[in-house]
Amino acid sequence: MQQLQNVIETAFERRADITPANVDTVTREAVKQVISLLDSGALRVAEKIDGQWVTHQWLKKAVLLSFRINDNQVIDGAESRYFDKVPMKFADYDEARFQKEGFRVVPPAAVRQGAFIARNTVLMPSYVNIGAYVDEGTMVDTWATVGSCAQIGKNVHLSGGVGIGGVLEPLQANPTIIEDNCFIGARSEVVEGVIVEEGSVISMGVYLGQSTKIYDRETGEVHYGRVPAGSVVVSGNLPSKDGKYSLYCAVIVKKVDAKTRGKVGINELLRTID
């Protein structure tokens, strides 16, 4: 694996000079191998090690290199044709392979090659970009988007129209991460490498980026780039120092543990916020 990483790192340093016409065989095969490993879930761009999320930057670099070495090509779809550098993940799947891998894909959901989809996942008409990892039992609801290299945990619900940001455009240092057992409400956006920790509930229409203040009303603490585990979060505003205006923020209205969350439905958690 170290040899593979070295090839990617070296090629990335000279990426501006690489084209589909001049890329060498070693680099092409290395990138192809990484994309295949990401696609199968054998590798992932980020993983939790000893309680901390670690981003494997070289894998992200391989994803970026794939755009340098591949030409656009015609891609067949059910109702249309496409023209892109990245093939679709399910282009060669037959019924037996879908049965074996054990997830559902509702048309016209689109998943790019290099994204991993785990068992018991349901993809409604949605979009999952290259390098993303979607773990077991997760629902990606209608018109939700999972950005490049985003990491989605087990038993997550991404509601209709949710946007999970990617790392490729604009280029971000770390992927956006939604940990296990989280609920992300409809039309919410989580971007710029924000981490939503395990068991959190994000209400409808909440926008979270690195500069978003995440205000805990119980403690008065303000978080940036991280929603603490077990948080119930809604949209809000905080006043300016001079009191003349207010700016958008996200508000942690309560904390819940797994036991409470198991007994109380998501809707009830969001309704009783006073």
UniProtKB/Swiss-Prot annotation:
PROSITE patterns: HEXAPEP_TRANSFERASES. Keywords: Acyltransferase, Amino-acid biosynthesis, Cytoplasm, Diaminopimelate biosynthesis, Lysine biosynthesis, Repeat, Transferase. Its main location: cytoplasm. It is found in: Cytoplasm. GO terms for biological process: diaminopimelate biosynthetic process; lysine biosynthetic process via diaminopimelate. It comes from the Bacteria. It is an enzyme of class 2 (transferase). One of its GO terms (molecular function) is nucleotidyltransferase activity. Homotrimer. Belongs to the transferase hexapeptide repeat family. This is 2,3,4,5-tetrahydropyridine-2,6-dicarboxylate N-succinyltransferase. The lineage of its organism: Bacteria, Pseudomonadati, Pseudomonadota, Gammaproteobacteria, Enterobacterales.
